[in-house]
Regions:
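C-terminal beta-strand-rich structural cap/linker in extracellular carbohydrate-active enzymes
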Residues: 180-196
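Short helix/strand-capping connector loops at secondary-structure junctions
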Residues: 82-84, 173-176
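Short beta-strand element of the conserved SAM-dependent methyltransferase core
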Residues: 61, 135, 167, 193-195
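Loop/helix patches that line or flank the sugar-binding groove of alpha-linked glycan CAZymes
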Residues: 2, 10, 16-155
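Short, glycine- and charge-enriched coil/turn segments that flank and shape catalytic ligand pockets
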Residues: 20-21, 163-166, 181
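A structural detector for beta-sheet-dominated domains
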Residues: 64, 126-128, 160, 171, ...
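Beta-strand-rich binding/interaction modules
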Residues: 154-174
Length: 196
């Protein structure tokens, strides 16, 4: 699956106002944790913006704030000036809460558990609600449960019926972390919990 490509407006531009960064991160997590092969268009991992004409959707990668730094380029011609909300890659690499580090962590989780990408996907409709979306993925005898909270509110859900014991990975867009104990999952706003 892909969330954006070179013919579409960049995803960070979809979200404005309160919680725009958290929504941008959550959208990346939902895309990258879908089953199948994931695709990440360059610049999405740092929240680049670009809409309107094709040239503006294909702005040069923002490696550094220094226009003369190694790897920097200009163009394309006819691109509209676009205000960028988030820092360049070099700065985001140093910030543990940046979009870049969130995307990097999401990809690490995807790679650590093959059932996420390759598994048979089951939407747990009876356990999901307005704030929580739950999927079970099974592959080669392994099972993972992914719980997404894409809302601005904290959410709790009992998943004891799914037969999982431990939280093995989590993604948080704020400093508040998800938790899991005795079948009860508690997720702060805009977070993900992976259980096995």
């Amino acid at each position: 699956p892909f969330y954006t490509n070179h013919d579409m407006g960049r995803s960070a531009g979809y979200y404005n106002g309160d919680n725009a960064e958290e929504k941008t991160k959550m959208a990346q997590a939902m895309n990258l944790l879908m089953p199948g092969n994931a695709f990440l268009y360059y610049g999405e991992e740092i929240g680049m913006r670009g809409t309107a004409n094709d040239e503006t959707k294909r702005l040069a990668m923002r490696w550094s704030g220094d226009s003369k730094a190694k790897g920097m380029c200009v163009g394309p011609q006819n691109a509209e000036e676009t205000e960028q909300t988030y820092d360049t890659l070099d700065k985001q690499m140093e910030d543990p809460y940046s979009i870049y580090n969130f995307v990097k962590q999401t990809i690490s989780i995807r790679n650590a558990f093959p059932e996420i990408a390759r598994g048979t996907n089951t939407f747990e409709k009876d356990l999901s609600n307005d704030n929580v979306c739950i999927f079970t993925r099974e592959y080669n005898g392994e099972k993972a449960v992914l719980i997404f909270n894409p809302s601005k509110d904290e959410a709790s859900v009992d998943v004891s019926s799914l037969g999982v014991n431990d939280a093995v990975a989590m993604l948080q867009t704020t400093k508040k972390a998800p938790s899991y104990k005795d079948g009860a999952a508690k997720l702060p706003a805009y977070s993900v919990l992976v259980l096995k």
